[in-house]
Structures are given as C-alpha cells and as structure tokens.
C-alpha cells in the first residue's frame, strides 16, 4: 500500500511534476535504499542461518532478486506514490516490501524474525496472511501483474458510474514485476483486455535484471517488450543508464563505450559483473583499447570505480529512476523497462546461480 500522508513526509514527493528532490532529500532516499537492502537481505539470512531449526533444512529466499528491486521500490514508496495509489510487488521482492513497511512503522520486528515461518511475514505478498498493507497477493508469478490491469479498469468503472466516494482521488495502479513474469500467458491476455477497454492510470515497472531461475534472459527481449506494449497503446520508457554512464558517454570514446555495452550479451555482462573491475578492464582493453578516449577513461578509474561505472544501470540510479517516474504527465498506461543487476551491491551480483543463492555469515557481516 502507498504511504499515508504522515509517513510520506520522510522524503518530499514530486510525483506528476518535472522536478527532482533536492540533494539532501536524495541523500536521504539513498540512505533508506541501503537500509532496505540490508534489512531485506537479513530477513532471509536470519531465516536460514540464525533462527533455530529442528531439521537444518534450507528455508529459502531470494536475496539477489530483492537486491535488483530495492532502488525501484524505494523510489516508489518513499517519493512517488500517493495514498490513493495501489501496488503489486513481485513475489521474490517480498522481503523488500516488508522491510519498507517496517521502516514506515507498519511491520513488526517479530514478524520479520519469523519470515517464512508460521505466523510470520510471508514469502510472497499475501493479503490474507500478511499483517502489513498488501494491496495485491502476488504469490504465483504473473497473476499479480494481470490483476493490476483489471483493478485499474474496475476503478475506472466505479468512478464512471458514480460509485466512488465524493472527492475521492483517482490513483494509479502500479505493478513492480520481474522480467520472467513476461513468460506467463495471462500477462498478454490482460494486455489485450486493457487495449479493448482503454485502460488508464496503470504502471508496470519491469525489474529487467535479465536473469531468472531458468537462466539468462534472451538478448533481444527488450525490443519484443517495446513491440508488444506499443501495439496495445502503452508508452514504453527505457530506463537503461545511470548518471555516471550518461556522463561517461559524453566524454571522448563515450559513443564506443555505449555501443560496447549495448551489444554486450546478457550472459557476458552478468559474468563481468560478478568478476569485477579487473575483468571489465581486461575486456574493454581488448575490444576498445585502440579507441580514442578509452585509455584515458580506464586510467581515470581504479578497478572499484570502473566496476561502479560499468554497473551504473538506470534501475539502480536513484536520480535517473525518479526522473523517469516523476515526468509522467498523463494517464496513458506506462511500461518502465528498468535495467538492473540481479544481486546488485551484494556478493551475489551477476552470478549465474544467484536466483536462490544465499550470502554466508561473513558476507552478511
């Protein structure tokens, strides 16, 4: 559920305008983002490594899937959403949702400590079993996404037939979805129904980390997404590069760097993300070493800085994310394709087996 008016004052919201938060507010949002990442990771860590267990079996959880969605959910809940908005959170990001609700004071520590156990916070958002403000149950991938479209149409029907409360604002319906949810047929059935009935005030935010339980996503999926959604009248916004990369593209050799990233396969990009700065440097030297400006770029960045630059995707850059969200000016359905990294800012980032991977005690310390 969207923040109530008192809770939302933690970060000044500018939804529906072309302005961005001031630097102090942006710092606050990024601090909240870090808290949400640690707390969501800890929920899963506690359930698997700390909480007493009778049988010692793995409880499970998806730390990498949470990490890819933290920036997007922080931006939405702490800056963009209004009280009348409703949200479906992708199943595997349930710990991030619970962490944010805890920061709002709507979730208890006891519930977090009992995550994935009887009576505790649920593995996937549940309206019937969770104690915090879940708007849509999203336990089976794809179902929550489709439900948001029909909810938007029902909300329109209620208003058009004079059944809404007097003065009740017409909020948005938002789905934060995983890219693998586009494998579900009901999502495309819903899209067609929305086109038939002129759905409005609907946002689908795709956490485009390009990794799933089944493997690395096809390299050309984005173009298919753009085609599918454009055909049924949606506005498609590609949120691909963060501000660090955007700045680098303006420097000598920047065009070649952007082309290299654009043509880099999802599989190679994930592998380099896991391997780190030295691996990025080696590949860039091999492929672009003779390109004017690239040597200077590499010399100006140590391995850590180069890794930060090359992984500065739009879905992890708070400023770029807020620019995309806060510049929507009308009620046309919006599809945000937010490029992210599965496991971002954790040791799991980019690893081929990170879908159900768990950080160990040393990595969580």
Task: Please give the residue ranges for each predicted region.
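Generic start-of-chain signal for non-secretory N-termini
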Residues: 1-41
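Long, well-ordered, tryptophan-enriched scaffold segments
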Residues: 18-22, 208-365
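Cofactor-binding active-site loop characterized by glycine-rich and histidine/acidic residues
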Residues: 24-36, 40, 44-52, 63-197, ...
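Generic beta-sheet signal
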Residues: 85-87, 171-173, 202, 332-340
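Short internal beta-strands
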Residues: 87-90, 201-209
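Active-site flanking residues adjacent to catalytic metal/cofactor-binding acidic residues
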Residues: 177-180, 206-207, 338
């Amino acid at each position: 559920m969207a923040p109530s008016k008192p809770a939302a004052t933690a970060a000044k919201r500018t939804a529906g305008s072309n302005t961005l938060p001031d630097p102090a507010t942006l710092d606050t949002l990024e601090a909240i983002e870090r808290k949400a990442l640690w707390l969501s990771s800890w929920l899963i860590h506690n359930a698997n490594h700390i909480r007493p267990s009778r049988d010692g079996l793995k409880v499970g959880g998806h730390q990498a899937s949470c990490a890819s969605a933290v920036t997007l959910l922080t931006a939405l809940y702490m800056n963009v959403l209004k009280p009348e908005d409703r949200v479906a959170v992708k199943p595997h990001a349930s710990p991030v949702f619970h962490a944010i609700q805890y920061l709002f004071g709507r979730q208890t520590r006891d519930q977090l400590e009992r995550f994935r156990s009887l009576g505790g916070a649920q593995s996937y958002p549940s309206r019937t079993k969770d104690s915090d403000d879940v708007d849509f149950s999203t336990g089976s991938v794809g179902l929550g996404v489709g439900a948001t479209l029909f909810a938007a149409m029902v909300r329109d029907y209620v208003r058009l037939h004079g059944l809404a409360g007097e003065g009740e604002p017409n909020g948005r319906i938002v789905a934060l979805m995983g890219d693998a949810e586009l494998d579900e047929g009901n999502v495309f059935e819903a899209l067609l129904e929305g086109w038939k009935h002129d759905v409005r005030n609907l946002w689908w935010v795709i956490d485009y980390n390009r990794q799933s339980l089944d493997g690395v996503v096809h390299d050309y999926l984005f173009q298919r997404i753009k085609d599918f959604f454009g055909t049924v009248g949606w506005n498609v916004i590609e949120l691909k590069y963060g501000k660090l990369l955007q700045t680098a593209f303006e420097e000598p050799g920047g065009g070649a760097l952007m082309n290299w990233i654009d043509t880099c396969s999802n599989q190679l990009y994930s592998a380099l993300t896991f391997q780190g700065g030295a691996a990025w440097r080696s590949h860039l030297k091999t492929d672009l070493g003779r390109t004017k400006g690239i040597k200077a770029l590499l010399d100006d960045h140590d391995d850590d800085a180069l890794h930060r630059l090359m992984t500065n995707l739009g879905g992890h850059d708070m400023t770029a994310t807020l620019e995309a969200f806060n510049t929507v000016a009308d009620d046309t359905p919006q599809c945000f394709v937010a490029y992210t990294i599965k496991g971002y800012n954790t040791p799991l980032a980019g690893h081929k087996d990170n879908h159900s991977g768990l950080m160990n005690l040393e990595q969580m310390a």
